C-alpha cells in the first residue's frame, strides 16, 4: 500500500474517516466500512485495490433519520492487511481525535480528497455560494488541510474548535473553494461520483457583477501595532501601512482595550 500512489492515499484517508478496525480474540479482527448504498461503487474500488479477500454486502434498517436506510458494507479480515493499515495510522477502536496524516511520504491531494469524501462537503450554500469544508476532531488532520489549502490557493485558515462540540470545521468559499476543488478533484481521480459532480459544478459559478471578493485578512505584527499606537492620526497610520482607516481603527481600539495584547 504505497501512499504515494493517489488511489491508495485516497483510500487510506477515507478509511481513517469512515473505517473501523475491530480487534477480536487472538489474531482475529476486521476492517469494516459502512456507507450509503448510493456510494457502494467506492467500496468496490477499494476491494479491487486490495490484494486480499474482502466482501461488499448490503443491509436495510431503520435509523433516526429515515424509516428505512440501505447501506453498503465492506469487510476485510486479513491480519496482514489490518496490520499494514494499523501501522500506517488507522488505530483500532475509537479514533476521531487520534488520527493523523501518515508518517511516511504520501499523496496529500489523494489523502485529503479521501477525507473530504468521507467527512466533508462540497457544493453550494443556501445563497448559492460555492464551498468546500471538512469536519474533524483531529488537530493534525485540520492542520494538514489548512497547510495544503494555503499551498494550493494562498488562503490561510486559523484552527479553532467549535465551542459546542469541540470539532474543527475548516471552510473555504467562493473563488478559493473553486480553486481548491479544481485541484483536488481532477479528471479521472478516484472519488465519490456525487462529490466529483459537485466539484465540477463549482467551476461554472461566476461572482455577480459588482460583488467584490473580501480583502485578505491582515496579519498584524508588533511593528505594525507600534506604528498604530504612535501615529498622530488613524489616517497617517492607514497611509503608512497601506490598509483602510476602518481596519486600522478597529485594530487600535482592540489594542487600547486589551482585546489583543500590546506589542512587546
Model-predicted regions and their roles:
Residues 1-264:
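Internal intein/HINT superfamily modules and their associated LAGLIDADG
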